[in-house]
């Protein structure tokens, strides 16, 4: 049956081509259309097929050079192999085998396998390849082979749509710019699309920047809270490490720590001391308000040093010792500087100005209340005399400041010698005008019990105010004698009394200046 069918097919080669014969035979036997399938036809049957089907004849292999060309039949010989240049349909060797079955040939090394052969037919559904990154956009299309060449024939608008559907806005905008640079100018639609993608990209960047700013602000707030918590923990740890400093008031100090109270660790005693205001420190240490706050920290140190040098005394005496010269502030040194400056300026002014003489002002008898100045040859009225008396009061104040400097010097000396203040309590400094020395007299004790303490400290060369009647009379002798007539009357007596009073005033004025 098979040989008859083969013979009939060979006879019909003149009327039809061999290709059409194979297709028709395959369609009739399998009842299916094999026009779209791509297979290879083995040129020679296998050895197994020869052994099993030795009685059956093998269908010959035919090759066609052209569509219209005539074909030549080739016998079924095992040594000859021919490859078909065109797509062929497999031949069914026997009734039990399927025509699409993969039958290996005897010379398998010379014949290509089914996986190596590719179909020359192209499907209408072509795959669209997308680049992995924007940088390799052009390389992926160039490596796509014939598919890339076919896609380049499409319009630019379709290519832009296919690319933007697979990529993000940034990659799509870059791909559009690459296409514009490669293919030249695109349409208005592609330009508008690139514009929109660029705007969206900028909006996303701006939103990302705002998110980073909000995140930065939240991180800063978290850092500040952490710093406050760390500070409170440090203060709590320091309070627990030094329980003797706080004593029974540990809870109160912990509350103050939570409220934000600041503490200072003393380097000498390693104690945690809470900071207090200036008013509280002045009230606790009994320091006047005019004093400087620097002395409040140094008072304890000096008091401890003095207590170590001196023998131990009772508690009442220690409290009195704390009120020594060292408990006072540094304003005392400032006061000393001011007093010395005043004394120096005053001494310089005295050295530069000439001393007034007794003949500068001479009383006259022409008009009461007037004086004659010999230097300026003019009259001086009562107003100028009052001004001179005001200057004399200022000189009195300066003399008082000269006494205050010696008071300060004596206090400093007693502090340096380490003598307690109770020895000098109630004592008032007095200036001995005869010896020019400074003396202290105790007013609380009797004169017999406590002797007078005398310090041979020389006084500055300052002019002293003379108020004694004896010195006034001696200085009045320097004035001119006024001739008084022999005839003494009541008017002359009144003038004489007025002249004596005026002389005393002039002498006092000269001494003050």
Curated annotation (Swiss-Prot):
Pfam families: TDA11 (PF17084). Residues 190-240 form a coiled coil. It is found in: Cytoplasm. InterPro entries: Tda11. Residues 26-180, 347-400, 417-450 are annotated as: Disordered. Residues 62-76, 161-180 have a biased composition (Low complexity). Belongs to the TDA11 family. This is Topoisomerase I damage affected protein 11.
């Amino acid at each position: 049956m098979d040989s008859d069918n083969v013979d009939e097919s060979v006879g019909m080669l003149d009327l039809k081509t061999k290709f059409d014969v194979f297709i028709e035979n395959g369609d009739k036997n399998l009842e299916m259309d094999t026009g779209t399938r791509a297979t290879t036809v083995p040129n020679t049957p296998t050895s197994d097929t020869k052994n099993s089907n030795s009685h059956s004849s093998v269908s010959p292999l035919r090759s066609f050079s052209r569509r219209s060309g005539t074909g030549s039949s080739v016998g079924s010989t095992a040594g000859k192999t021919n490859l078909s240049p065109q797509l062929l349909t497999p031949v069914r060797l026997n009734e039990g085998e399927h025509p699409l079955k993969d039958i290996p040939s005897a010379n398998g090394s010379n014949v290509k396998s089914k996986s190596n052969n590719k179909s020359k037919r192209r499907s209408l559904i072509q795959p669209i390849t997308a680049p992995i990154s924007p940088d390799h956009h052009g390389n992926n299309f160039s490596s796509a082979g014939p598919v890339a060449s076919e896609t380049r024939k499409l319009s630019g608008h379709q290519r832009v749509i296919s690319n933007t559907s697979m990529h993000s806005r940034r990659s799509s905008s870059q791909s559009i710019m690459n296409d514009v640079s490669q293919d030249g100018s695109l349409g208005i639609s592609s330009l508008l699309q690139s514009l929109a993608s660029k705007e969206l990209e900028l909006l996303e960047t701006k939103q990302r920047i705002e998110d980073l700013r909000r995140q930065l602000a939240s991180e800063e707030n978290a850092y500040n809270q952490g710093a406050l918590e760390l500070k409170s923990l440090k203060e709590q740890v320091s309070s627990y490490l030094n329980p003797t400093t706080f004593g029974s008031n540990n809870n109160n100090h912990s509350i103050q720590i939570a409220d934000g109270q600041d503490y200072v660790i003393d380097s000498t005693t390693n104690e945690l001391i809470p900071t207090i205001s200036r008013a509280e420190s002045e009230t606790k240490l009994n320091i006047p308000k005019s004093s400087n706050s620097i002395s409040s920290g140094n008072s304890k140190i000096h008091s401890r040093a003095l207590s170590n040098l001196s023998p131990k005394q009772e508690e009442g005496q220690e409290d009195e010792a704390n009120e020594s010269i060292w408990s006072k502030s540094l304003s005392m040194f400032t006061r000393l500087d001011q007093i010395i400056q005043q004394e120096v300026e005053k001494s310089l002014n005295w050295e530069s100005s000439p001393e007034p003489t007794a003949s500068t002002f001479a009383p006259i008898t022409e008009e009461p209340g007037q004086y004659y100045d010999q230097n300026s040859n003019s009259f001086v009225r009562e107003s100028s005399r009052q001004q001179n008396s005001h200057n004399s009061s200022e000189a009195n104040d300066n003399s008082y400041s000269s006494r205050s400097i010696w008071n300060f010097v004596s206090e400093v000396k007693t502090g340096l010698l380490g003598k307690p203040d109770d020895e000098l309590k109630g004592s008032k400094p007095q200036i001995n005008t005869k010896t020019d020395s400074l003396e202290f007299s105790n007013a609380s004790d009797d004169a017999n019990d406590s002797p007078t303490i005398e310090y041979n400290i020389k006084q500055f060369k300052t002019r002293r105010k003379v108020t004694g009647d004896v010195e006034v009379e001696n200085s009045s002798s320097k004035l001119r004698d006024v001739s008084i007539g022999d005839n003494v009357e009541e008017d002359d007596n009144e003038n004489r009394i007025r002249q004596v009073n005026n002389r005393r005033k002039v002498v006092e004025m000269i001494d003050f200046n």
